[in-house]
């Protein structure tokens, strides 16, 4: 159509020249050849026009498909948002359920502590009552021994008065032997009493040292684990954030380059369309330009596809970044809550340890005072016994009788010490049974023992196996 317009303008201005000749100077064959050549060019132009129309239809179809896919992806994104909201609601419901469970656990734990305190008070009252009874029995025994010693003194005085003149040498020899035996017995029982006192002191110090070591080790391990977990989480999310930011920046730069290329190609397409409308150059130049435009069009399609893929990847990365940021905030909240729970449990654990240490120290102090009182009583009895023997100069039969009574008194004191050790074993057993009940309650509510944050302290007496059997089965320590 453009050449025809130029032909009309040529007629108005002057006679056109074809192949260097005017139309009136051309022969019929030349005119027919020129007409056939023009028709061939017209056919080729029509074919090229049809080809470009087909390409335009393909591009439009591809654009429609891409638009539908975009709408589908938007619908999927909306569905995902709804699913995320539903998941968040479910998560809030689960959090409420877990909070309710924790409240129930705290309530039961408080009830157990109250029961323990009540049981401890009852046990302490019973122990005090038994101690009073034992004290009264010991006092009665002491009065009986005093009466017997008084009677023996009177009898010994009569015997000594009757035998003093006849057996002076024999009494002197017996006195020397008896003094030697008394010194041996005194040394033996002093050694036993010192060993017993040292052993009890060593047990008490060792037990307190072990309790402090276990407590410090547990606290140090717990704090180190929390610090390592927090450092790992912080480094992990910092790396993810930096990588995502770098990737987003690179994708934005790629999008900017693609957008520039697209604008450049659109301008070139506009220029090419204008050139196609103003076709006046030779056919060879048009073919070369057409091949160049086909290459540019292919590059444009490829760049456009890359741009679409890049946009899709950018959206995915942005969504992943938002999800990671949301997860990071949730984890930070959970970590803060766990830290608060850890601090609360640590405070309760420290208070419980201090209370146990105070009770143990009080019991050890009471036992030490009782042991000191018994030791003083034994020493006093031995002094009185030595004075009686030194004043009475008994015969071997009377000496044997007095020694037997002294052994009976010592056996009674040892029995009292064993009873006190048995009471201590019962208290340790009750404490360990309470720990077992606490662990069973935690497992019943689905809380792992590792999540408690500390290891419960089991009480035991050094050298004895206590708190290991069923409840109530506590043997007398040996």
From Swiss-Prot:
Basic residues bias (residue ranges): 1-12
Main localisation: cytoplasm
The UniProt record lists the keyword Coiled coil: yes
Entry GO terms, CC: axoneme; ciliary basal body; cilium; cytosol; extracellular region; Golgi apparatus; intracellular membrane-bounded organelle; microtubule
Region of interest (Microtubule-binding), residue spans: 115-258
Disordered: annotated segments: 1-33
Domain of life: Eukaryota
Coiled coil: 242-427
InterPro entries the UniProt entry points to: GAS8, GAS8_dom
Subcellular location: Cytoplasm; Cytoplasm, Cytoskeleton; Cell projection, Cilium, Flagellum; Cytoplasm, Cytoskeleton, Cilium axoneme
Molecular functions per Gene Ontology: microtubule binding; small GTPase binding
Pfam families assigned: GAS (PF13851)
Keywords: Cell projection, Ciliopathy, Cilium, Coiled coil, Cytoplasm, Cytoskeleton, Flagellum, Golgi apparatus, Microtubule, Primary ciliary dyskinesia
Record-stated family: Belongs to the DRC4 family.
Record's disease association: Ciliary dyskinesia, primary, 33: A form of primary ciliary dyskinesia, a disorder characterized by abnormalities of motile cilia. Respiratory infections leading to chronic inflammation and bronchiectasis are recurrent, due to defects in the respiratory cilia. CILD33 inheritance is autosomal recessive.
Primary role: Component of the nexin-dynein regulatory complex (N-DRC), a key regulator of ciliary/flagellar motility which maintains the alignment and integrity of the distal axoneme and regulates microtubule sliding in motile axonemes. Plays an important role in the assembly of the N-DRC linker. Plays dual roles at both the primary (or non-motile) cilia to regulate hedgehog signaling and in motile cilia to coordinate cilia movement. Required for proper motile cilia functioning.
This protein's name: Dynein regulatory complex subunit 4
Name of the gene: GAS8
């Amino acid at each position: 159509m453009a050449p025809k317009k130029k032909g009309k303008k040529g007629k108005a201005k002057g006679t056109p020249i074809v192949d260097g000749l005017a139309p009136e100077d051309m022969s019929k064959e030349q005119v027919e050849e020129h007409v056939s050549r023009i028709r061939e060019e017209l056919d080729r132009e029509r074919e090229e026009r049809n080809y470009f129309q087909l390409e335009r239809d393909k591009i439009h179809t591809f654009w429609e498909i891409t638009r539908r896919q975009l709408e589908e992806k938007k619908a999927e994104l909306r569905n995902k948002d709804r699913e995320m909201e539903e998941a968040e609601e479910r998560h809030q419901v689960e959090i409420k359920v877990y909070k309710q469970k924790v409240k129930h656990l705290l309530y039961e734990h408080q009830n157990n502590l109250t029961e323990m305190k009540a049981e401890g008070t009852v046990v302490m009252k019973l122990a005090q009552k038994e101690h009073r009874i034992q004290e009264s029995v010991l006092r009665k025994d002491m009065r009986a021994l005093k009466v017997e010693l008084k009677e023996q003194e009177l009898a010994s005085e009569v015997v000594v008065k009757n035998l003093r003149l006849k057996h002076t040498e024999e009494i002197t020899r017996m006195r020397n032997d008896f003094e030697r035996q008394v010194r041996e017995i005194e040394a033996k029982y002093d050694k036993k009493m010192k060993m017993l006192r040292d052993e009890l002191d060593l047990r008490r110090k060792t037990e307190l040292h072990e309790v402090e070591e276990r407590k410090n080790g547990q606290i140090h391990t717990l704090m180190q684990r929390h610090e390592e977990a927090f450092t790992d989480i912080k480094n992990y999310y910092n790396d993810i954030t930096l990588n995502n930011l770098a990737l987003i920046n690179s994708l934005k730069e790629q999008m900017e380059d693609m957008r520039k290329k697209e604008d450049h190609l659109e301008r070139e397409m506009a220029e090419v369309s204008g050139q196609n409308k103003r076709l006046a150059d030779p056919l060879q130049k048009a073919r070369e330009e057409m091949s160049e435009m086909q290459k540019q069009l292919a590059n444009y399609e490829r760049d456009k596809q890359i741009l679409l893929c890049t946009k899709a990847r950018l959206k995915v990365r942005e969504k992943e970044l938002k999800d990671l940021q949301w997860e990071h905030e949730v984890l930070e909240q959970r970590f803060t809550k766990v830290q608060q729970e850890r601090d609360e449990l640590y405070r309760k654990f420290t208070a419980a340890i201090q209370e146990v240490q105070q009770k143990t120290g009080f019991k050890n102090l009471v036992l030490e005072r009782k042991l000191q009182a018994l030791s003083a009583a034994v020493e006093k009895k031995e002094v009185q016994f030595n004075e009686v023997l030194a004043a009475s100069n008994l015969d071997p039969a009377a000496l044997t009788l007095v020694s037997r009574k002294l052994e009976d008194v010592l056996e009674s004191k040892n029995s009292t010490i064993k009873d006190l050790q048995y009471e201590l074993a019962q208290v340790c057993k009750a404490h360990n049974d309470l720990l077992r009940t606490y662990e069973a309650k935690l497992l019943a509510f689905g809380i792992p023992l590792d999540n408690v944050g500390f290891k419960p302290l089991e009480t035991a007496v050094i050298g004895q196996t206590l708190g290991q059997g069923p409840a109530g089965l506590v043997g007398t320590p040996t």
